[in-house]
Amino acid sequence: MNSRRKFVGALLAGAVAVGAAWATPALSADQVIRVGTLKLIHGITPFFYERFTPAGYKFEIVTFDTPTDGKNAVVTRSVDFGTYGLAAATLGGAAGEPVVIIGAQCNRGMAVVAGAKSAINSIKDLAGKKVAILPGSTQEVVILDRLKMEGMSIKDIQPIRVSFSDMPAALERGDIDAYVGAEPGPSISVAKGVGKIVEFPYSTPTGSVNMVMTTHQAMLKDNPDLVKTFLAMHRKATEYAMGNRGAFIDMAMQKLGQPRPTIEIAAPNVELTWNTDADWVTRAKYYGSQMLEMKQIRQLPDYSSFINTSFVAEVARLK
C-alpha cells in the first residue's frame, strides 16, 4: 500500500513538473506584433519601434514592394498593423475591405523626376513623354491632379507602369523620360547625376499627405488596448527619428542598402508623422474624391469607419 502511494505521488509530481515546464515559456513569452511596411525611406519608422517597446512585446517587421501588397497583408491579417500609401488604403476601403486608417506614417517623400540633360523642367513639359507611374499608388492620383491643374490629362503623356524600385534604373537606361517616384528613388537618380527634380508635387489640395498606418477592423473591437499601445510606440519612434537625423539616416542606409549621399539628399523630402488631425482628414477625403472623379473607385469609403481618429487622439494627449 505504501509503495502504491509513493508511485501515485511520484506520478503526480511528474505531471506537475511537466505542466510547469510547459507553462513557464507560455507565461514569459512576449506578444509578437507583426507590422508591414514598404521598402522606402518614408516607411522606415517601424525599424525604430524596438527602442520603445514595453516589456511583454516584441516586433516582427515585414517589408513589401508595393502598397497593394501591404494593404492585402492587413486585410488577410498576415500583419497586425501595416503602413503604405493613402491610395491603396482608399482602394480597399472603397471596395468594402476591412481596413481602417488609425494614424499617419509620413508626409512628402515623392517627386517628379526627369533625365538630367532633358528639356523637361515643368509638368507641362511632360506632354508626349514616357512617364513611369505606379498604378494604385498615392503618386498616381497626385500626378493626375497636377496634370489637371495644368490643363492636361493622362492622355497628354505616355504612362508606363513601373515599380518604384525600378524607376531610377529605367530612367538611366532611357526606357522612360520621367517618373513620378517615391524616395529614395528620386535621390538615387539625382545622386548618380542621371536625373533632376522637376517638382515636389505638393501644391494640390492633397498637400503632402502620403503614407498611412492601418489595421484590420476586427483589431479595434478585439484588442483596442493593443492599438493604443502600438500607436504610443509609433508616436515615440516617429518623434525620435525626426529629432535624430543621424539615427534616421543610419537606419535608412542599413535597411535600404543605399549610400549616405543618396539618403542625405532624400531625408529633407521626408516628414515622418503619426497624427491624423482635422486638416489631415480633410486632405485625405479630398484625395478620395479625386480617386472617385478619376474613376479609380466606384464609391467613396465610409469615412465614419474608414478613418478612425479616436485612438490617435488619445495618444496625442499623452506626454
Predicted regions and their residues:
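Pocket-lining segment of extracytoplasmic ligand-binding domains
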Residues: A87-A88, I160, S165-Q254
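Residue-level signal for alpha-helical transmembrane segments in multi-pass membrane proteins
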Residues: A15-G19
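Conserved C-terminal helix/tail region of periplasmic/extracytoplasmic solute-binding proteins
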Residues: L292-K319
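Phosphate-coordinating loops and pocket residues in cytosolic domains that bind phosphorylated ligands
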Residues: G9, G128, A191, N308
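Short, glycine-/small- and polar/acidic-enriched structural segments
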Residues: L27-S153, Q158-F164, D177-E183, V194-F200, ...
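Secondary-structure end/capping motifs
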Residues: D222-R298
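N-terminal secretory signal peptides and thylakoid transit peptides that target proteins
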Residues: M1-G14
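N-terminal signal peptide c-region/cleavage motif recognized by signal peptidases
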Residues: A23-T24
